[in-house]
Amino acid sequence: MIDFRENWRIILLVIVVIVSLFALVSPTLASGPDSNSAVVQQSSQTNLQYGLELAGGTRVRAPLVGVTAEEVEFEPANAREVEQRIATAIDGAGPADVIARPVTETTGTVEVTVEGVSTTELQSILESTGYTASTVRTGVTETTRQEVVRILENKINEAGLSGGTVQEVTTAGGGHFILIEVPNEDAASVRSLVSERGTVVVQAHYPQDDIYTQQTVLQQDNFQSIGSAQEGQSGGAYVPVTVRESAANEFQQATVDTTLARPGGTRCTYSRDQNSTEPCLLLVVNGEVTNSFGMAPRLADSLRGGSWAQDPVFQLQTANVSEAQEVAINLRAGALPAKLDLTGDDGGTTSFISPSQGENFRTDSLLAGLVAVFAVSGVVFLRYRDARVALPMIVTALSEVLILLGFAAGIGYPLDLSVIAGFITVIGTGVDDLVIIADEVLAEGGVSSRRVFQSRFRRAFWVIGAAAATTIIAMSPLAILSLGDLQGFAIFTILGVLVGVLITRPAYGDILRALTTGNL
């Protein structure tokens, strides 16, 4: 008669294995055709999903062009002036190539994203224009990198490239790169996609003869600068926009003619009802309305009075910073605030893996895993020459891999070569721990009772627990930091260690106890 209370660890292992098998093969967990997860290809027999290395596609890894001056002394209200003055001092640069971002009430950062500008040159330009900075370094700010990631994600999604991912990765030396992975696309298409510019226009939406009509009031090249999202002093957020002087008068007159600049301003309800709203400004990106805005009374008064064209700046108000960031992205119509350095001089690389090569990698990975299993099995049988000890050891170790595969399938984590390496590592470390258990239990002769077994097993488990803690601590930085492929390796190595310590090692202990003492 099986004592379920004494063998609950074995029962737990069986349950977890069954759940993992369900996650692997159940059609109810299969990703639909519209899934937008970081997936390149899904196995037809299982729910496993493969990354670029095992399925094919293009990977672009490149830094951003730019130099940044930190702790530059200027007030937030003067950010646009800073951009214009510094841009004027740089040959071939416009205000859009300079980003002045307030950090405190008296200082901020200044980024120049023109190719060929060195830190020494930016330092000299700042001094010649009357500004001082504490440090000038190569690279852009974290805010700019995050904005680039969001813009590229939008571009990939709009292009209909299912499974494309964009993320920021950091090297061990502190370098920052943008990593783009797009499935089933060649390198030339991906490079063109991430560098091309969309189209954006601003239209006036207003009633004319009882029929609502749209009139374009600003073209893409009418913008002199598009600021970053900023928090408002009285709540909400906004995006500051500067219009070129050559287009300012025409825009000013258009807002009057379309009744946008009416006394008291306008309240836009376009998102709720397009045919009953007061006049609105519509932001149209690639032919699609992405945002709508009313007009503040003060701005309407300056437009009607004709004074606005002398200082052609206005703010697009939003409810929160997140929405303002989306507006800034839409205004740029896919234009990056800083270019990707695809020349390769500073570490930028583009790689393409054909689908056939990815299939070969899958086959080779499977063979490597089988070789690891048979090699470990052979060594274990040679070591113990006792199937009662060796066979459960191999089955338990393989169950760890099965559990990890089920976990990967359940959450839709794409498998790549680094994850496969993690699985092979789990097999090795798992069997190593099981050998420690078997040696400790059997080293002092036969096991005469359950009490003797438990005493020896506890000693072995302390050693295993200490080794597991060391592995987790060592792998944690790789799992937390954005280090590309190393992250997947570290994550699944840590998961394998946790599964082993919490589930499979205790279960193997119960199996070994039952086989050596004859008590279930």
Swiss-Prot record:
The chain crosses the membrane at residues 10-30, 364-384, 391-411, 417-437, 461-481, 483-503. It comes from the Archaea. It is found in: Cell membrane. Gene3D superfamilies: Multidrug efflux transporter AcrB transmembrane domain. It is a multi-pass membrane protein. The keyword Transport applies. InterPro entries: SecD/SecF_arch_bac, SecD_arc, SecD_SecF_C. One of its GO terms (biological process) is protein targeting. HAMAP family: SecD_A. Part of the protein translocation apparatus. Forms a complex with SecF. Belongs to the SecD/SecF family. SecD subfamily. This is Protein-export membrane protein SecD. It comes from Haloquadratum walsbyi (strain DSM 16790 / HBSQ001). The lineage of its organism: Archaea, Methanobacteriati, Methanobacteriota, Stenosarchaea group, Halobacteria.
